[in-house]
């Protein structure tokens, strides 16, 4: 077996999966959803949330989504814009929420990016 080729293929596949999970919504699409009433969900810890947040965002930590979100968001068709500190946890949240039957979930990415999008900058 040619190990360098095999390892290269694995790296490409893993990279594709990670990119797919972390792909962020465009600024234009996010702003369109915000104007139409999308909810912004911050999946960071409560401590992180208290240190700075997007105006109007709801804090539901990643580990609490499965239990908390259905109680707080009854309409599964509600557009949800998720973010965290860097975009990694929000990528996981997006996948988890889609698996829970929420089809309209978009990853804003990092806190800084989410703040800029919401502020219109």
PLM regions: where:
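Short, surface-exposed ligand- or partner-binding patches at beta-edge/loop junctions that are enriched
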Residues: 82-83
């Amino acid at each position: 077996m040619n190990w360098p080729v095999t390892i290269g293929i694995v790296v490409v596949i893993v990279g594709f999966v990670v990119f797919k999970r972390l792909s962020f919504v465009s600024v234009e699409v996010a702003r369109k959803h915000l104007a139409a009433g999308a909810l912004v969900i911050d999946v960071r810890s409560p401590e992180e949330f208290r240190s700075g947040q997007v105006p109007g965002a709801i804090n539901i930590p990643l580990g609490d989504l499965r239990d908390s979100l259905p109680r707080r968001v009854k309409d599964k068709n509600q557009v949800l814009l998720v973010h965290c500190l860097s975009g990694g946890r929000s990528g996981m949240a997006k996948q988890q929420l889609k698996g829970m039957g929420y089809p309209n979930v978009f990853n804003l990415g990092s806190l800084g990016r989410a703040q800029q999008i919401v502020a219109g900058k």
